Amino acid sequence: MAAGMYLEHYLDSIENLPFELQRNFQLMRDLDQRTEDLKAEIDKLASEYMSSARSRSSEEKLALLRQIQEAYGKCKEFGDDKVQLAMQTYEMVDKHIRRLDTDLARFEADLKEKQIESSDYDSSSSKGKKSRTQKEKKAARARSKGKNSDEEAPKAAQKKLKLVRTSPEYGMPSVTFGSVHPSDVLDMPVDPNEPTYCLCHQVSYGEMIGCDNPDCSIERFHFACVGLTTKPRGKWFCPRCSQERKKK
């Protein structure tokens, strides 16, 4: 594939990337603003509770505490949604980077293959010209000697035959391109510095959920690895932390 085709295909693949990034960043800004609004509401409710705690009934104080708790719950949901958006944005960009690395590797492999073909053709062409020149000189000498002696003709013929048999035109080795197949470079290495998560000890990708146990050693899990298809409502604990909680 020509270099222009590689570039054209890659540019087509990233055509919508700026709009997708802009959308995700705008959603994250909206989540930040909603979180700040809720934090202001929590401060207001907390001040109201502290200033009038003695004069309020138990039911009124409990209602205020529930409002504060619900506001904190929504803040946590907004935070989780923002983390999911950030991970989705990272995966989106990383996918295009891997695509670019793969196309570059294929392009370099194509260049190597063409260089080998060109070198092989130039070598065969120069050696072929040299062989033809030698045969022409031998034939000329044979013709000049043939006028004076009939015995020179068979020798000249033998020399010409020998030249044809040993000519590089008929003895060039075949070139194998197996070492530069583009398919050998499709699997790109994973960044060794990228952190791993989940029970599978893999890098972050797709939809993930965080364990609500602050002491969880793993912290985040892939939906598929913990049997989830949608984000559960309320608190969620990973399988390990759930077992520990049951023991207590």
Swiss-Prot record:
PANTHER family: INHIBITOR OF GROWTH PROTEIN, INHIBITOR OF GROWTH PROTEIN 4
Site keyed Histone H3K4me3 binding: positions: 197, 208, 212
Chain positions of all zinc fingers (PHD-type): 195-244
Family: Belongs to the ING family.
The record's note on its domains: The PHD-type zinc finger mediates the binding to H3K4me3. The N-terminal coiled-coil domain mediates homodimerization.
Citrulline carried by residues: 132, 165
Compartments it resides in: Nucleus
GO CC terms of this entry: histone acetyltransferase complex; nucleus
A GO molecular function held by the record: zinc ion binding
InterPro entries, alphabetized: ING_fam (IPR028651), ING_N_histone-binding (IPR024610), Zinc_finger_PHD-type_CS (IPR019786), Znf_FYVE_PHD (IPR011011), Znf_PHD (IPR001965), Znf_PHD-finger (IPR019787), Znf_RING/FYVE/PHD (IPR013083)
Organism of this sequence: Bos taurus (Bovine)
PTM statement from Swiss-Prot or TrEMBL: Citrullination by PADI4 within the nuclear localization signal disrupts the interaction with p53 and increases susceptibility to degradation.
Function: Component of HBO1 complexes, which specifically mediate acetylation of histone H3 at 'Lys-14' (H3K14ac), and have reduced activity toward histone H4. Through chromatin acetylation it may function in DNA replication. May inhibit tumor progression by modulating the transcriptional output of signaling pathways which regulate cell proliferation. Can suppress brain tumor angiogenesis through transcriptional repression of RELA/NFKB3 target genes when complexed with RELA. May also specifically suppress loss of contact inhibition elicited by activated oncogenes such as MYC.
Positions of modified residues (N6-acetyllysine): 112, 127, 129, 145, 147, 155
Motif Bipartite nuclear localization signal boundaries: 127-147
Main location: nucleus
This protein's name: Inhibitor of growth protein 4
Positions contributing to Zn(2+) 1 binding: 198, 200, 222, 225
Entry-linked Gene3D superfamilies: 6.10.140.1740, Zinc/RING finger domain, C3HC4 (zinc finger)
Coiled-coil region(s): 25-118
Region (Disordered): 115-160
UniProt-listed PROSITE patterns: ZF_PHD_1, ZF_PHD_2
Assembly behavior: Homodimer. Component of the HBO1 complex composed of KAT7/HBO1, MEAF6, ING4 or ING5, and one scaffold subunit: complexes containing BRPF scaffold (BRPF1, BRD1/BRPF2 or BRPF3) direct KAT7/HBO1 specificity towards H3K14ac, while complexes containing JADE scaffold (JADE1, JADE2 and JADE3) mediate acetylation of histone H4. Interacts with H3K4me3 and to a lesser extent with H3K4me2, the interaction augments KAT7/HBO1 acetylation activity on H3 tails. Interacts with EP300, RELA and TP53; these interactions may be indirect. Interacts with EGLN1. Interacts with BCL2A1.
Highest taxon in the source lineage: Eukaryota
